[in-house]
Amino acid sequence: MDKKLLKYWKNCLLDAERRSRSLTKEARVTLRIGDKLPEFILRKDIPLIFPKGKQKENDEKRKIQIAPCVFLPEYENGWTSRQNAPEYPFLISATLLPDGTFQVCDNKSERIPVFVRKFLSPNARNDRTVASLSNVDRLLSEFDTEETDWKKYWSACETLFQDATGLTFREMNYADKPEIIVVKAPGRGMAQKIINLYDKLLESKSSHPLLELLIRKKQETLLPVPEKQQVYCNRTHWAQMSGEFPLSVSQRETLAMYTEPGSSDIFAVNGPPGTGKTTFLQTVIANRIVHTVLEHPDDPDIIVASSANNQAITNILKDFKVEQPSDGKPVNLLTLRWLPGLDTLGLYLSGKDEQKDQYKMMFNTKGDGFPNDYDDPARLEEYRGFYLEHFNRFFQASCQNEVECQRFLRKKMKKIRDEIGTCLNVASLKQYGKEMADKGFLSRLLRKFQKLPSYEAIISDWEQTADFKERYDKLIVNSEYKSLPYTEDMAVRLDISYRYLLFWYAIHDREAEFIRRLAECDKEGETRGREDYTERLKRLACVMPVFISTFHSLPKYMVCVDNGEWDAPLYDAIDLLIVDESGQV
């Protein structure tokens, strides 16, 4: 594997972490204490940095950054061609105690001072330079992070700065009134997880096929646009997440290319807003869930939808909300969750606990949040009773446990899958039979389809289900669905009926699988080891089929404890990764 790109991406991320801060525009406290050691800010000044509405408890520590020196604007003939505001090339992280006293950070990685990247050579021609990147990297690698005495730590930071730049803090400051700026520390640490992952990948001697496919320079073979018969008679299209509208032509063409056996493991979908990319992604997820239940039912997939963009994540979370019963609207038992307290198909992996009332959330790898509340064997009988009541009411059955329910569901699902194949064959024969007979394929067609019912009989049987017919009648009010060719009309009918049914049957199968796995798990002996943690993720995936996270947060969730390593990456644990707004990643 060519690792040059990995090194480049890592360095770009490191540079972004060391970007310049516009401290003149931020809430700050300015200390003008000459050559004295900064040891505190006044207690009354703390709200200037941490407004009262956003403060933690009064007895909690807070993270701050201190700028001990300033790069002043340079003027010539009364004007400057460069930055005309002060800039701060060096930042020291610290802890602010409740009384305003400064303390060395508890986390050793936060004790390493930050040289802002734009001031280190090589840099842009119009940026000023304080030191070289190579020299700074060497000095930082030798910096002592064990020191906890504030006075000695501050002295070590100044020595580091002087070794790199040849200047003291006092010499790079206002001549008459030197100042030290204190600001709230930015939210940090997310990028560190990604940087750690880069380091492990750069050291790894194992094969990582998907990553190798992404970074190799060889151009992929372009797939041809599929023929109409392949588009509308797609025999691997088994599921739809929505039963209200069928796929559009472009969505159906894209799905045909995606499910083509020769398709790459990395599949890009482009299109302006409003062209149906989200609906297509929902179809991919629905299809994957159904295929998994029917083809390897004992191994639930881990599906992740991710993005670098917070707004995109919010949109994804909304897309996986399950419609709840409301006044005046009849309850559709099929499309409700058959486990208590669930109104979504998506689990949000994020540490933002202020959003816990909006979404089902997992805050960390310990499972704080929804997992620890829900993934609880003590609630097993509650789940089993709730599920069986919904299951037996919907199917008019009398199943006694989740395993019986799964057998019942999978039998029905296989029958529906076969029915989809029959419908496509019948529509294909009706539309293309004469054309193929003219080409001499009649005898083979007759042998293949001699046991098939007629197209008219298939449609008649299909319309016996009042719900299907009602949805179809609403659709054909629109001219685009009237008088369609047989295969296109059949594709529309299947989207709003059998494919939609299969998706929800698969969801309810996975709910039963969650109950079965919860009954068998040993929560007391469960660890964060590779096997236990992967098993827990799969169990959660039975309840929440889609995990949703930003790319900044995701790496910290996909780690386990392995051979004494507390953050060993779970390589290849994700079965399907969907990247929204991928151009921003």
Regions found by a protein language model. Name each.
Residues 1-236:
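N-terminal accessory nucleic-acid engagement/regulatory domains that precede
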Residues 312-342:
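Conserved helix-turn-beta segment of the N-terminal RecA-like "Helicase ATP-binding" lobe
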Residues 1-99, 103-106, 346-490, 494, ...:
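Charged C-terminal transducer/switch regions of large nucleotide-driven machines
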Residues 267-286, 296-316, 548:
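Conserved RecA-like ASCE P-loop NTPase motor core of nucleic-acid helicases/translocases
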Residues 197-243, 450-573:
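Conserved helicase NTPase catalytic core signature
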Residues 568-585:
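SF2 helicase catalytic motif II
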Residues 285-290, 319-325, 561-566:
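Short secondary-structure boundary/capping segments
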Residues 244-265, 549-550:
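N-terminal pre-P-loop "Q-motif" helix
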